[in-house]
């Protein structure tokens, strides 16, 4: 016996609006249903319903596919012969069919977003915008409402585009050929692959152009070369062969893409392509911000390239923007350094393997055979990244006496090896910081390691000044002048002065041509002389200054010491140090402003300030004028030079007038 046909619970047709509002069962009788007739209500039927909004993930999927299509289009346009630098407004128009497809995508997604947030109130007189179509076979029926396109629609369009000379998405160089004003440009501006809806891909894309400028292969190659010719001298953290191997493979992780953008940004700032640096900076920062928003990773999984990119970006901001912005950006790099524990890279190594302090530095001593070349390069790159952050922390805080972030006492990472060893994969064991600072004799360490030691001494000088400049912070005035604080101050001051003088003498043994051609060595020597002036200023700031007549002074001097702890003696040493900075500054024009260390204007301005205010040397005015000329040559590439020139120009006007009057009288 056949089963009787079951009648559905829902009657055919649409319920009236009043029953829908009250969630009542409507009998769908026209022109007035039973419920409205019984309650004497106005019965309204709407035969044309608004389409439902997209389901979860459909908008994201369309955005992802559109971003991929834009990357394909840009790759297609970029392979055509462009001029050396092509602005976005000057690009040729894309093919008509591809541009129509992009416009159709924009309309579809914009309409879907509007439908998702629209109210449920519907009006029979509202006209719905029809979905534009690429061809007649894909066109929506006339008068039909806008809805999510057929899943096969994009596949058909993709096959049409893929039939051209475009390359697969996994081998793309991301760039924006058009001005993006829609919400879909978010992924492109952040330079990350579109987030997949259901699967995870390991392929990454990089972007070699920004929203307002496109870089040709020649420009990118030039920026890469400029980085190693000019920037690497004061930021020696990148392994040259590894980097160019990644460029040749054209495959990057997101962190490596961030690093590549940061390198080219800093290289553009130190070249005639400075007009490109602002656009590259904006793109680099957007890419780094996007990468920072990814889910947190374990501390040992922090990508080293991500830390390096933030460090290079902070150097760019110091060169082009200013100290305060550089400090904010560097703070993020310092925290990443701490999260990655780069200060403990050699915590498990045997400290007894390092040579004693009386022997020459061990930077040329080969490491055990168990450490191969690749492992050495990995460890050395981590060491150099940490020490670059360490130096940047101290040199940046020196500007305004800010507290240090990376503490010296917790460091268990060896000093960087020689550049020749690093670039040629020659393993070498270097000393720890405390061991290197105790060594005497001729230095055989790298210029980077010497800069680290001098920056460490400068950091100790800053701590020394902050601790004793205000006598009330440790003891009362009478207690400070006659108690243990006086003795402690003399011991620390004498130790720092001897340590700085010893390192300066070791650096003076380096040949003059090597110093003139090496921006790191030149800056390190000026930094040592600046530390001498810093110690002299510390003596001037304490509440007691007549230390030479104190009976405790001669007892505190070491047996081989030749300097006096009096303020006058320190002032004389500072005057000599300022004169040495003037002598070294004469090497800057031959060095080129494009290769000058970012913090070199600080040491030059410190010497100019000392010579213009408190130098007993009658030729100090000539030295000030020379330093001002050097700073004026650096102001186009170094923001510190511009800032110091504004203050020094006004400060030296009165001094020059008094100096001219004195010369006239004689």
From Swiss-Prot:
Q: What induces it?
A: Expression is positively regulated by the secondary metabolism cross-pathway regulator scpR.
One GO-annotated biological process of the protein: DNA-templated transcription
Please indicate if the UniProt record lists Transcription regulation as a keyword. yes
Q: How is it used?
A: Asperfuranone provides anti-proliferative activity in human non-small cell lung cancer cells.
Q: Which InterPro entries match?
A: TF_fung (IPR050815), Transcription_factor_dom_fun (IPR007219), Zn2-C6_fun-type_DNA-bd_sf (IPR036864), Zn2Cys6_DnaBD (IPR001138)
Q: Which UniProt keywords apply?
A: DNA-binding, Metal-binding, Nucleus, Transcription, Transcription regulation, Zinc
Q: Which PROSITE patterns match?
A: ZN2_CY6_FUNGAL_1, ZN2_CY6_FUNGAL_2
Q: Which Gene3D superfamilies match?
A: Zn(2)-C6 fungal-type DNA-binding domain
State the compartments where it is located.
Answer: Nucleus
**Which source organism?**
Emericella nidulans (strain FGSC A4 / ATCC 38163 / CBS 112.46 / NRRL 194 / M139) (Aspergillus nidulans)
* GO CC entries: nucleus
Q: Where is this region: Disordered?
A: 184-206, 347-373
What does the function comment of this entry state?
A: Transcription factor that regulates the expression of the gene cluster that mediates the biosynthesis of asperfuranone, a probable antitumor agent.
Bias class Low complexity marks the residues at: 353-369
Q: What happens when the gene is disrupted?
A: Leads to decreased production of asperfuranone.
Q: What is this protein called?
A: Asperfuranone cluster transcription factor afoA
Write down the DNA-binding region ranges.
16-43
- Does the record carry Transcription as a key word? yes
Molecular function (GO) terms listed? DNA-binding transcription factor activity, RNA polymerase II-specific; sequence-specific DNA binding; zinc ion binding
């Amino acid at each position: 016996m056949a089963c009787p046909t079951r009648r559905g619970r829902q009657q055919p047709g649409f319920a009236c609006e009043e029953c829908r509002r009250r969630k009542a069962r409507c009998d769908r009788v026209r022109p007035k249903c039973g419920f409205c007739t019984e309650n004497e209500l106005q019965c309204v039927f709407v035969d044309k319903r608004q389409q439902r909004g997209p389901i979860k993930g459909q908008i994201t999927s369309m955005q992802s596919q559109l971003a991929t299509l834009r990357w394909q289009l840009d790759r297609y346009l970029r392979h055509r012969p462009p001029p050396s630098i092509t602005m976005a407004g000057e690009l040729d128009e894309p093919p008509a069919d591809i541009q129509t497809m992009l416009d159709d995508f924009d309309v579809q997604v914009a309409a879907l977003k509007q439908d998702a947030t629209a109210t449920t109130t519907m009006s029979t007189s509202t006209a719905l915008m029809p979905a534009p179509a690429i061809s007649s076979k894909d066109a929506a029926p006339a008068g039909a409402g806008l809805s999510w396109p057929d899943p096969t629609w994009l596949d058909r369009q993709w096959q049409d585009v893929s039939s051209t000379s475009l390359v697969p998405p996994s081998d793309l160089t991301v760039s924006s050929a058009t001005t993006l004003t829609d919400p879909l440009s978010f992924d492109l501006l952040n330079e990350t692959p579109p987030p997949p809806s259901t699967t995870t891909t390991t392929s990454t894309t990089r972007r070699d152009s920004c929203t307002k400028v496109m870089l040709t292969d020649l420009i990118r190659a030039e920026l890469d070369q400029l980085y190693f010719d000019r920037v690497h001298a004061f930021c020696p953290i990148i392994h040259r062969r590894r980097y160019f191997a990644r460029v040749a493979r054209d495959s990057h992780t997101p962190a490596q893409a961030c690093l590549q953008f940061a390198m080219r940004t800093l290289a553009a700032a130190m070249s005639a392509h400075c007009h490109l640096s602002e656009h590259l900076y904006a793109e680099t920062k957007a890419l780094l911000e996007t990468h920072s928003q990814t889910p947190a990773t374990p501390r040992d999984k922090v990508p080293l390239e991500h830390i390096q990119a933030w460090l290079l970006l902070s150097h760019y901001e110091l060169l082009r923007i200013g100290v305060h912005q550089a400090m904010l950006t560097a703070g993020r790099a310092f925290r990443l350094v701490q999260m990655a524990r780069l200060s403990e890279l050699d915590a498990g190594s045997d400290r007894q393997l390092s040579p004693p302090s009386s022997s020459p530095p061990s930077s040329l001593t080969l490491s055990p055979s168990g450490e191969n070349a690749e492992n050495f390069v990995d460890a050395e790159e981590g060491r150099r990244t940490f020490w670059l952050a360490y130096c940047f922390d101290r040199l940046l805080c020196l500007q305004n006496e800010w507290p240090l972030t990376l503490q010296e006492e917790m460091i268990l990472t060896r000093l960087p090896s020689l550049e020749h060893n690093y670039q040629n994969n020659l393993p070498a064991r270097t000393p720890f910081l405390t061991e290197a600072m105790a060594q005497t004799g001729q230095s055989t360490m790298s210029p980077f390691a010497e800069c680290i030691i001098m920056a460490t001494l400068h950091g100790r000088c800053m701590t020394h000044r902050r601790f004793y400049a205000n006598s009330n912070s440790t003891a009362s005035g009478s207690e400070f002048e006659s108690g243990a604080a006086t003795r402690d101050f003399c011991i620390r001051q004498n130790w720092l002065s001897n340590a700085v003088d010893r390192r300066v003498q070791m650096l003076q043994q380096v040949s003059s041509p090597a110093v003139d051609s090496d921006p790191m060595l030149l800056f390190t020597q000026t930094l040592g002389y600046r530390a001498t002036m810093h110690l002299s200023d510390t003596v001037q700031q304490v509440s007691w200054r007549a230390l030479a007549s104190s009976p405790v002074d001669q007892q505190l001097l070491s047996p081989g010491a030749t300097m006096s702890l009096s303020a006058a003696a320190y002032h004389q040493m500072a005057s000599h140090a300022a004169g040495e900075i003037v002598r070294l500054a004469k090497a800057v024009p031959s060095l080129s402003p494009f290769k000058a260390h970012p913090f070199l204007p600080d040491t030059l301005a410190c010497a100019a300030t000392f010579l213009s205010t408190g130098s007993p040397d009658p030729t100090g005015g000539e030295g000030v004028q020379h330093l001002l000329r050097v700073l004026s040559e650096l102001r186009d590439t170094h923001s510190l030079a511009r800032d110091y020139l504004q203050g020094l120009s006004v400060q030296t006007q009165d001094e020059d007038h008094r100096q001219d009057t004195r010369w006239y009288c004689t």
